[in-house]
């Protein structure tokens, strides 16, 4: 028997980056979790169905976080005076090593999953650690919470501390075993191949992971061109490759299956060509890019090449879980890029940033992040009454104030 859900309220979503659709006191109808109608009145076929009326509240799509490190949740706000590589060595690697203990993992991951719920993040793409058992704990907790995610067991077999490094062969064996075990979580929580970044993965490991991604038909996530020191390091490790991006491409870790790369701040035009060719998604992480002095990603330039873009909190390089705050930070950084760097690339608009935080990132999951017909229904109910305002506002203005 089909399950029908009808929501009533002030509806807002972005079917395209340039456009808000706003429907005052409108209706969303979903059958078996998929939107079949969104409009001003109830079609006759559904006239007898129960309606959940949210009054004057706003109804928006759930947020999508395309890049976060779940094990770093307790490190938020630490090391903001350091750049990427010293920050990893001082704070990140010691914390991630603790996840060899599954009980510690359950404690931290439980708090992280609760934070996703509290901030309206209904879909996420997450890094775990190198520990397969702890990564399965994260997947279990997400499934029990009813949150959809791609979760990665991290791979690292070089240039890593002794307490957080794998042997190449064992890393691939563990990854295969983890992929097999991940099938228990069904369609809601899925695995994603996760080489940490090129400096921490040998060519043998990267090639093996590329083969596993194709064998199991699972997507790939990693980091790309976040920091100048990192880029120089990659060049010294792989002098045979023309650029950082092509190291991934040559190891079949870009474009053979759906791929998302975090940061992408310092890409050359040739690398942007490769991103466009492979339709690799960029996870733009504005808070992290500022906190670790990495730079400001050329988002408008990437948009002009029709490269898919989502937003990432990048916990804990980023210190805030809320994607509402991440999207407003993305707008602010785009203004600085425009004023200080290149007047040819206009700042992001609210609709563009909101799109990235919903449908833009949601594309990695399929038809997600919008209330268009055929989309999976992820919805947030927003009560903005505490934001005192005696003036009449449009729905877009109310949303902007709440964000």
Feature names for model-found ranges:
Residues 1-46:
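N-terminal metal-binding scaffold of metallo-dependent hydrolase/deaminase domains
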């Amino acid at each position: 028997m089909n399950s029908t859900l009808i929501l009533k309220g002030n509806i807002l979503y972005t079917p395209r980056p340039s456009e808000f659709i706003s429907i005052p006191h409108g209706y969303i109808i979903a059958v078996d979790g998929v939107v079949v109608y969104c409009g001003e009145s109830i079609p006759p076929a559904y006239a007898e169905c129960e309606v959940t009326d949210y009054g004057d509240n706003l109804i928006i799509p759930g947020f999508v976080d395309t890049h976060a490190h779940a094990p770093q949740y307790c490190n938020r706000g630490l090391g903001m005076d350091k750049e990427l590589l010293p920050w990893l060595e001082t704070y990140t690697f010691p914390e991630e090593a603790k996840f060899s203990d599954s009980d510690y993992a359950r404690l931290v991951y439980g708090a992280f999953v609760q934070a996703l719920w509290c901030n309206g993040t209904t879909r996420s793409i997450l890094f775990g650690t190198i520990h397969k058992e702890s990564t399965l704990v994260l997947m279990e907790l997400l499934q029990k919470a009813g949150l959809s995610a791609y979760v990665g067991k991290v791979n690292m077999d070089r240039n890593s501390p002794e307490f957080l490094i794998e042997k190449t062969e064992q890393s691939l064996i563990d990854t295969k075993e983890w992929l097999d075990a991940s099938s228990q979580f069904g369609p809601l929580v899925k695995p994603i191949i996760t080489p940490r970044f090129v400096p921490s993965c040998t060519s043998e490991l990267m090639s093996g992971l590329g083969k596993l991604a194709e064998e199991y038909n699972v997507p790939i996530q990693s980091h790309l061109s976040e920091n100048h020191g990192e880029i120089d390091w990659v060049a010294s490790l792989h002098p045979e490759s023309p650029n950082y991006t092509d190291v991934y491409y040559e190891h079949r870790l870009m474009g053979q299956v759906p791929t998302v790369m975090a940061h992408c701040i310092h890409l050359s035009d040739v690398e942007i060509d490769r991103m466009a060719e492979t339709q690799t998604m960029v996870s733009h992480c504005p808070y992290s890019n500022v906190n670790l002095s990495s730079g400001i990603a050329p988002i408008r330039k990437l948009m002009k090449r029709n490269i898919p873009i989502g937003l990432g909190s990048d916990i804990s390089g980023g210190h805030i879980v809320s994607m509402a705050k991440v999207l407003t930070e993305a707008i602010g950084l785009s203004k600085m890029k425009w004023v200080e760097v290149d007047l040819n690339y206009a700042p992001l608009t609210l609709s563009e940033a909101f799109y990235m935080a919903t449908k833009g990132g949601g594309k990695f999951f399929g038809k997600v992040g919008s209330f268009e017909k055929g989309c999976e229904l992820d919805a947030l109910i927003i009560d903005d009454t505490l934001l005192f305002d005696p003036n009449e506002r449009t729905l877009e203005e109310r949303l902007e104030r709440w964000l």
